[in-house]
């Protein structure tokens, strides 16, 4: 029995990808310049982090579980104004589970996705730098 468990753990893929889940992901074009993607589950969150360009911004609620959101400037990569940061933060807040919607303000962390690394746990990430925080 122990041998079978070890076999399963050793040969289980670290990142099981299912490209069919992209239809569940929320996408939006904001002001004709920004592409916003918000995950609806762990697979979407992993796909967002894995497939986003290094110039994109990544968003997540501080201290609460939530969807990941990524904003890409399709006109001027790497340039982001406050309006799109507020919009993406609001989408992340709206995606949160119970407990967060009862709060008047929540904190949303964001930073360039080049400082976000995936972990072996699907949908979880490691931040290489301290994020900026906005209160929504």
Regions found by a protein language model. Give the residues of each.
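Duplex nucleic acid-engaging cores and interfaces of nucleic-acid transaction enzymes
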Residues: 2-136
């Amino acid at each position: 029995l122990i041998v079978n468990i070890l076999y399963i753990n050793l040969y289980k893929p670290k990142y099981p990808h299912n490209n069919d889940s992209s239809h569940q992901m929320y996408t939006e074009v904001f002001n004709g310049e920004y592409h916003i993607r918000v995950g609806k589950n762990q697979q979407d969150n992993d796909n967002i982090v894995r497939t986003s360009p290094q110039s994109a911004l990544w968003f997540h609620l501080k201290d609460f579980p939530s969807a990941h959101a990524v904003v890409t400037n399709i006109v001027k990569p790497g340039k982001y104004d406050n309006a799109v940061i507020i919009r993406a933060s609001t989408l992340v807040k709206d995606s949160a589970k119970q407990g967060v919607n009862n709060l008047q303000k929540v904190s949303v962390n964001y930073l360039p996705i080049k400082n976000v690394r995936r972990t072996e746990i699907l949908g979880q990430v490691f931040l290489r730098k301290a994020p900026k925080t906005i209160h929504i």
